[in-house]
Amino acid sequence: MGIESSCDETGVGIVRWHPDGTCELLADEVASSVDQHARFGGVVPEIASRAHLEAIVPAMRRALSAAGIAKPDALAVTIGPGLAGALLVGVAAAKAYAAAWDVPFYALNHLGGHVAVDTLEHGPMPPCVALLVSGGHTHLLHVTDLAAPIVELGSTVDDAAGEAFDKVARLLGLGFPGGPALDAAARDGDPHAIAFPRGMTGPRDPRYDFSFSGLKTAVARHVEAAQRAGVAIADLPIPDIAASFQEAVADVLTMKAVRAAQDMGVDTLVLGGGATANSRIRSLAEERCAAAGLTLRVPKPRLCTDNGVMIAALGAHVIAGGARPSPLTVASDPGLPVSVSQIA
């Protein structure tokens, strides 16, 4: 069983490990508080924590019922990174259930879960590069084994890509969450209408790092210039702005991800995280992987967003790799680095 509570989704998932290295999905329960955050234009940590408190026990019961079991053989939980208060709810629940059931407890990394969940659809994972893109994270990772430490090749130096989507969507009056709203608006737009900048793509820039604050600022300045010229927000070419912004983000993400895979000598690229549900990120990744001779693995959108199944899948791989259980005294770590797969 895996429990996830790092942001605004309360997830409980159950998987069964098979000797051939595959995981079978038995239960996937997710309760989201996203509607409670919409009027604030972003996730409010206190609201998220209270929502987890209300949702965690019912989600546990539903998952056990769906799997047809009384208790799991082991229990894994997201110990970090994430919102401090949100993490505390999931970790406290996991410790209590593990103690009551007398089952092994594993404190795992949220980001590793986003990689591991792909095995539910595509089977055992070969050495690969993983691109994780969400509201709080943008990382390029080198993965040799899900039971081994993951190497971070690069990350964003400022805004996460998903955060930039949310902020630009709010600027354009498209609402929250911004990712789906921008994606929908961009479908009717011209991705080449506006030449927005591609951050950190110069010859002297870090090879695998990202920056989206300049792009976000460029969109804001474009809108401000139109407003100074007397154009109201409602009269702006929103589809063109959305499509051009989305193209800039997808261009940089996929270019650097394919480059990293080639540099690492692997033939597989894995996408994970909620923002990889974006249609342009997926389609451009497909185009560039095909051109580079890489295999692209992308979980279905439901598994890309936060869920308990991803933590259960990571837990199954960690256990199969011989990891010892975590002590019940471990504390959640909101800033846990991706290189720490488990706090033991």
Swiss-Prot record:
<keyword id="KW-0408">Iron</keyword>
<comment type="function">
    <text>Required for the formation of a threonylcarbamoyl group on adenosine at position 37 (t(6)A37) in tRNAs that read codons beginning with adenine. Is involved in the transfer of the threonylcarbamoyl moiety of threonylcarbamoyl-AMP (TC-AMP) to the N6 group of A37, together with TsaE and TsaB. TsaD likely plays a direct catalytic role in this reaction.</text>
</comment>
<feature type="binding site">
    <location>
        <position position="114"/>
    </location>
    <ligand>
        <name>Fe cation</name>
    </ligand>
</feature>
<dbReference type="GO" id="GO:0005737">
    <property type="term" value="C:cytoplasm"/>
</dbReference>
<feature type="binding site">
    <location>
        <position position="110"/>
    </location>
    <ligand>
        <name>Fe cation</name>
    </ligand>
</feature>
<keyword id="KW-0808">Transferase</keyword>
<feature type="binding site">
    <location>
        <position position="278"/>
    </location>
    <ligand>
        <name>substrate</name>
    </ligand>
</feature>
<feature type="binding site">
    <location>
        <begin position="132"/>
        <end position="136"/>
    </location>
    <ligand>
        <name>substrate</name>
    </ligand>
</feature>
<protein>
    <recommendedName>
        <fullName>tRNA N6-adenosine threonylcarbamoyltransferase</fullName>
        <ecNumber>2.3.1.234</ecNumber>
    </recommendedName>
</protein>
<feature type="binding site">
    <location>
        <position position="183"/>
    </location>
    <ligand>
        <name>substrate</name>
    </ligand>
</feature>
<feature type="binding site">
    <location>
        <position position="166"/>
    </location>
    <ligand>
        <name>substrate</name>
    </ligand>
</feature>
<dbReference type="GO" id="GO:0002949">
    <property type="term" value="P:tRNA threonylcarbamoyladenosine modification"/>
</dbReference>
<dbReference type="InterPro" id="IPR000905">
    <property type="entry name" value="Gcp-like_dom"/>
</dbReference>
<dbReference type="GO" id="GO:0005506">
    <property type="term" value="F:iron ion binding"/>
</dbReference>
<keyword id="KW-0963">Cytoplasm</keyword>
<dbReference type="GO" id="GO:0061711">
    <property type="term" value="F:N(6)-L-threonylcarbamoyladenine synthase activity"/>
</dbReference>
<feature type="binding site">
    <location>
        <position position="306"/>
    </location>
    <ligand>
        <name>Fe cation</name>
    </ligand>
</feature>
<dbReference type="Pfam" id="PF00814">
    <property type="entry name" value="TsaD"/>
</dbReference>
<dbReference type="InterPro" id="IPR043129">
    <property type="entry name" value="ATPase_NBD"/>
</dbReference>
<comment type="similarity">
    <text>Belongs to the KAE1 / TsaD family.</text>
</comment>
<keyword id="KW-0819">tRNA processing</keyword>
<dbReference type="InterPro" id="IPR017860">
    <property type="entry name" value="Peptidase_M22_CS"/>
</dbReference>
<feature type="binding site">
    <location>
        <position position="179"/>
    </location>
    <ligand>
        <name>substrate</name>
    </ligand>
</feature>
<keyword id="KW-0479">Metal-binding</keyword>
<keyword id="KW-0012">Acyltransferase</keyword>
<dbReference type="InterPro" id="IPR022450">
    <property type="entry name" value="TsaD"/>
</dbReference>
<dbReference type="InterPro" id="IPR017861">
    <property type="entry name" value="KAE1/TsaD"/>
</dbReference>
